Regions:
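A short, N-terminal "cap"/entry segment at the start of jelly-roll beta-barrel domains
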Residues: 1-28, 108-109
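Conserved short histidine dyad/triad with adjacent acidic residue
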Residues: 32-46
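Amphipathic, hydrophobic secondary-structure cores in small proteins
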Residues: 47-49, 75-76
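Glycine- and acidic-residue-biased ligand/ion/polar-headgroup-sensing regions
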Residues: 49-60, 65
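A cytosolic small-molecule/anion-sensing beta-strand core signal
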Residues: 56-57, 72-73, 91
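Ligand-binding loop in jelly-roll beta-barrel domains
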Residues: 81-105
């Protein structure tokens, strides 16, 4: 069993009004809270990981390839591996992102 207490996690300032907090992970799965100020952007990108984003709070325009939808609290999207995707925050909020396999590039080794 892996248990991660919130007080043991690190809030990372990504700049530009965005934050990231890795909540839990193993090699197969990663859970990440991503914060956005209103008007900030999650730049369009792709990766080999399958990703699901669940809206904890706020409103977002979420784009996968050439399709854009507006999502809010309780909504979720699934991004298949290798697909271009990004978001624009239209009301300050947080996403809960799940990646499989885990994003090793997010993990800071000390």
């Amino acid at each position: 069993m892996i248990v991660v207490h919130h007080e043991d996690t690190l809030l990372q300032d990504l700049g530009g009004g965005n934050t990231r907090r890795i909540l839990a992970w193993n090699d197969d799965l990663m859970l990440v809270e991503v914060g956005f100020d209103s008007g900030t952007v999650g730049a369009t990108h792709s990766h080999v990981h399958t990703q699901s984003s669940f809206v904890l709070s706020g409103r977002f325009k979420y784009t996968i390839e050439d399709e854009t939808v507006e999502i809010g609290p309780g909504d979720s999207v699934i991004v298949p591996s290798g697909k271009l995707h990004g978001t624009v925050c239209i009301e300050a909020g947080k996403l809960l992102d799940v990646f499989t396999p885990a994003r090793q590039d997010f993990i800071t080794r000390t």
